[in-house]
Amino acid sequence: TEQVTSYRALMIAGPSEKGKELAAKVNAGEELTWEDVSSANWSVANSSSPAGYIYPSLWLQENFGKNITDLPHAVQSDSYGSAFARLASGQVDILCTYADARRDYEDEWTGEYGMTNSIWDDTAVVGVTPAIYNDTISVSKTSPIMDDDFKQALGQAFINIGNTEEGKEVIAIYSHNGYLPAQSSDYDSERAAQEMIQSLNSAG
């Protein structure tokens, strides 16, 4: 399996009348308006969730100059399972979730949630966030011992650890499979997300 360094959050429209309306618009190549998204019922996660709140809020900010806090019809779900149940029942029109979530809830959709069609037929992606980078091993920019040679050697050491079976066992405690090199610009979206969170916290 090829290692990935990031994932994306998706805004998924469900089988409600509004959900279908938004999906049809996006699938026709039209851009959603603020009126489109603000008139929908949204399911979001708690405010510390990257895929269920932070990055969808960043997407709203980049596309409409708004945040999740500006959505008049947003409810917080206690889990992705309950969010998908609400989407299936039509209680919400859009849910914010991680990119692989539909695969994870495919069986529940036609089982526990009682839907006739598959989750793939009943739902559609109406928004995609910037990349959410996975965990990072970072070093201090101000430490005098952190010269370029040391940084490169440290990075290569972690990559080497992740390339051995023994190393994989050690890093499995973090749910890591291995490491790949990164550059500072990979985390620009994360910096923007953190700035947005700080501005929301200071406004509240």
For every predicted segment, state its role:
Residues N41-P50, H73-A74, K141-P144, H176-Q183:
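Second-shell loop/turn segments in exported
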Residues T1-L10, E112-G155, A172, H176-P181:
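Periplasmic-binding protein-like
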Residues V37, L87-A88:
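Hydrophobic residues within well-ordered alpha-helices
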Residues T1-P50, L58-Q61:
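A conserved helix-loop-strand patch within extracytoplasmic ligand-binding domains
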Residues Q61-E62, A88-S89, D93-W120:
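A ligand-binding cleft/hinge motif common to bilobed small-molecule-binding domains
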Residues M146-G204:
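An extracytoplasmic/periplasmic, membrane-proximal ligand-sensing/linker region
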Residues N67-A85, A131:
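Short helix-initiation/N-cap motifs at beta->coil->alpha
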Residues E17-G19, S47-A51, G81, D100-D104, ...:
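Solvent-exposed loop/turn segments at secondary-structure junctions
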